[in-house]
Structure formats: structure tokens, C-alpha cells
């Protein structure tokens, strides 16, 4: 498609007319995108999904927990670093699967993710839980945690933490059943 002096809105207007019928006719999904297409600013996409091109089929989001872990003894949470979390409710992943997923995220994003689970009593267990024991109530309330939740955590400079959280969100969304709309 070629357009002279087109604005972003001009391009969207044309594509919103052209693409839905094509998606409906040739797409492999029963649900076609409808106009107007959802528009997400770069800042919102990075803060909410950890990516400037998020997979919106995944229902997981990225949450900021920088203020919640301020003053923690865990070195990656040191002052100046941004800390992001991806909460997965009712996650029954085994330790081996979690370790593999974290290794895959580290290879793809270049930064190591951390994790902990919420046990049946509401306490944190596994991964970095021992560094968060004094802030359990605050973190539980702020992130809306319930027993059975898995929390993937990333830390680093803002863009690195966001990027790693985005990769973690995508990997968790595809690995944990019920969080990716395949339709």
C-alpha cells in the first residue's frame, strides 16, 4: 500500500476497512478483528505487557513491584533498579519446568528472571521467597495474590526489566494452560 503524506490515522482508516473482511474470509480463526482496531501507546504497551508488540491473546499482564521491594537484601532489587512481576493464578508448574522456563527466558531476554509461589497458607515459597518474608502482606495485597499463584519477577534497568518481563509473560502464557486464547 502506498500513500502520500499519510498520517497514522489515515493508515488506520484504510486498514480498518480493508483487513477485517480479509481476516474473516481467509483467517484460520472464527473471530476476526473488528474496526476500530485497539490502539496502545508504546509506554502503555511496555508497562502493561513488556513488549511494544504484545501478544494480546495472553491474558497475563506485567505489574510494577519496585516500591514493594525497596530496601530488600536481594542484590538485583538494589536501589535504582526497576522490578516487574508477572502473576499467574492457579499455576501448578513443577520446579523442573519453572527452571527450564527461566533458563529459556534468560537466553531470549539476556536477563535472569526470578520467581516465587504462594502456598496454600498464603506464605511465599521457592525461588526468592526468603528475601520477601518481611513484605509478604504488602506484596500479597498489591499484586492481588492468592494461594496457588506463581509470580515471575524481573529486575534491572527499566527497559531491561520490561523486556525480560515481556518474554516471561509470553513464555508463561503459552506454557500454563488457560492463559492464551488460541481462537
Predicted segments, located by residue:
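Class II aminoacyl-tRNA synthetase catalytic cores and aaRS-like
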Residues: 2-183
Amino acid at each position: 500500500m502506498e500513500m502520500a503524506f499519510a498520517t497514522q490515522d489515515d493508515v488506520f482508516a484504510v486498514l480498518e476497512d480493508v483487513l477485517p473482511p480479509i481476516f474473516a474470509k481467509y483467517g484460520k480463526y472464527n473471530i476476526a478483528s473488528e474496526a476500530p482496531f485497539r490502539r496502545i501507546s508504546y509506554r502503555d504497551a511496555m508497562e502493561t505487557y513488556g513488549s511494544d508488540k504484545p501478544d494480546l491473546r495472553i491474558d497475563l499482564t506485567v505489574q510494577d513491584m519496585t516500591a514493594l521491594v525497596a530496601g530488600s537484601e536481594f542484590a538485583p532489587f538494589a536501589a535504582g533498579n526497576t522490578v516487574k512481576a508477572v502473576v499467574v493464578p492457579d499455576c501448578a508448574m513443577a520446579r523442573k519446568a519453572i527452571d527450564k522456563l527461566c533458563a529459556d527466558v534468560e537466553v531470549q531476554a539476556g536477563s535472569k528472571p526470578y520467581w516465587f509461589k504462594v502456598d496454600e497458607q498464603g506464605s511465599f515459597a521457592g525461588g526468592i521467597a526468603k528475601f520477601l518474608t518481611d513484605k509478604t502482606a504488602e506484596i500479597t495485597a498489591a499484586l492481588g495474590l492468592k494461594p496457588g499463584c506463581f509470580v515471575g519477577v524481573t529486575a534491572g534497568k527499566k527497559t531491561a526489566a520490561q523486556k525480560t518481563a515481556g518474554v516471561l509473560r509470553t513464555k508463561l502464557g503459552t506454557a500454563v494452560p488457560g492463559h492464551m486464547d488460541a481462537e
